[in-house]
């Protein structure tokens, strides 16, 4: 039910793929759609320290799942089954503050979210810390996802923003594409694409397949209620029945 584009054969981990077959492929179309959908991101004043994100920390994983949910529009419990936010006090009105130390980051059969957070942390540690800090800042906001997105929208030429702000903005886009396509698009590549695409409509971004495990977990085909070639979690004969509602796939 999940995975990469159906025409694509499994690709060796960490290989660069930039090959075109003809002028338009399904990957080109879906990648373009995902790049367009990837959010634009802005800033908060958080100091950056390399590798200060601990990928083995349950608290940091909770923040990463919340960040990913806000950016992709996919419910946290779909990204990480069993995910649950906990409060330090009994339920009240308004709700008590969230206690990250008691919250549950959830799991999935292949734990692909750990691959994604590890990849982002190794590539852009300060940017990932920046984004998780933004989630922490808005953790108890009544409309947390909207607050995160609103804080992450600005033009590249905004003079009030720093280079760190811009870097975090494009890292957020890379995280969106990781979840939807199970591939890594360098933030610098996405930034260059934004500038060059109007002049060169044939320009396509280079990317890396993250892992064979990730091949089966891309959300692009889940949203399309489909599955990648050679892998399916759906029961044989599912095509003879009407598809489930989209919310059964992505939550919400």
Regions found by a protein language model. Give the residues of each.
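N-terminal secretory signal peptides
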Residues: 1-24
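N-terminal twin-arginine translocation
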Residues: 22-28, 38-56
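Sec-dependent signal peptide hydrophobic core
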Residues: 33-37
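Immediate post-signal-peptide N-terminus of mature secreted/exported proteins
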Residues: 51-76
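Solvent-exposed, polar/charged alpha-helical surfaces in well-ordered, non-transmembrane soluble domains
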Residues: 62-65, 69, 114, 173, ...
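Structured domain cores in non-transmembrane regions
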Residues: 75-169
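Mature-region segments of soluble proteins
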Residues: 130-252
């Amino acid at each position: 039910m999940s995975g990469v584009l159906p025409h694509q054969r499994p690709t060796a981990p960490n290989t660069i793929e930039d090959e075109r077959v003809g002028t338009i492929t399904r990957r080109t179309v879906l990648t373009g759609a995902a790049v367009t959908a990837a959010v634009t991101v802005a800033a908060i004043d958080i100091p950056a320290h390399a590798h200060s994100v601990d990928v083995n920390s349950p608290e940091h994983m909770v923040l990463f799942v919340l960040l990913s949910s806000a950016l992709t529009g996919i419910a946290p419990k779909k990204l990480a089954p069993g995910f649950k936010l906990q409060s330090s006090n009994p339920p009240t009105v308004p709700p008590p503050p969230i206690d990250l130390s008691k919250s549950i980051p959830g799991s999935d059969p292949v734990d692909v979210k750990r691959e994604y957070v590890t990849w982002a942390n190794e590539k852009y540690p300060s940017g990932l810390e920046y984004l998780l800090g933004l989630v922490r800042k808005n953790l108890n906001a009544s409309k947390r996802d909207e607050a995160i997105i609103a804080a992450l929208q600005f033009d590249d030429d905004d003079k009030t923003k720093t280079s760190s702000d811009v870097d975090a903005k494009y890292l957020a886009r890379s995280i969106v594409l990781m979840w939807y396509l199970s591939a890594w698009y360098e933030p610098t590549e996405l930034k260059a694409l934004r500038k060059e695409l109007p002049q060169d409509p044939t320009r396509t971004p280079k990317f890396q397949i993250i892992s064979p495990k990730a091949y089966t977990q891309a959300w692009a085909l889940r949203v399309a209620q489909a599955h990648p070639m050679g892998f399916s979690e759906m029961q044989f004969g599912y095509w003879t029945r009407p598809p489930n509602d989209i919310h059964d796939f992505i939550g919400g």
